[in-house]
Amino acid sequence: MSDLKKFAEQLVNLTVKEVNELAAILKEEHGIEPAAAAPVVVAGGGAQGGDSKAAEEKTHFDVILKSAGASKLSVVKLVKDLTGLGLKEAKDLVDAAPKPIKEGAPKAEAESLKSKLEEAGAEVELK
């Protein structure tokens, strides 16, 4: 069971680039479409959404870039560094805001990412 916990922790801490690579591997080598997993995630999230205590005790957050603000170049560079994406991919992600920068991040990490992005001039939301 501890191996599964380690795997789950590694999975939660993947960067956006690593998630994209994982999706490509699952699709190419195993025929699993990433969209097939989406209903499972939505269904799981919906079941917990009705419990107000669970919402108050949330420990993992999605870091959502709402806009780059006035310092777009600084935000693109920071997104590149934080996610491990290439410069073009980071720029595309910033241009497509609102977009998640990191999903399922522990509370401390999510708050740290939010403060770094806000210091660079971005508008960020934790969900």
Curated annotation (Swiss-Prot):
Self-association and partners: Homodimer. Part of the ribosomal stalk of the 50S ribosomal subunit. Forms a multimeric L10(L12)X complex, where L10 forms an elongated spine to which 2 to 4 L12 dimers bind in a sequential fashion. Binds GTP-bound translation factors.
GO cellular component entries: cytosolic large ribosomal subunit
Record Pfam families: Ribosomal_L12, Ribosomal_L12_N
Keywords: Ribonucleoprotein, Ribosomal protein
GO biological process, one term: translation
Coiled-coil segments on the chain, per record: none
Domain of life: Bacteria
Annotated stretches, region: Disordered: 98-127
Organism: Amoebophilus asiaticus (strain 5a2)
Cited function: Forms part of the ribosomal stalk which helps the ribosome interact with GTP-bound translation factors. Is thus essential for accurate translation.
Protein name: Large ribosomal subunit protein bL12
Annotated GO MF terms: mRNA binding; structural constituent of ribosome
Family (UniProt): Belongs to the bacterial ribosomal protein bL12 family.
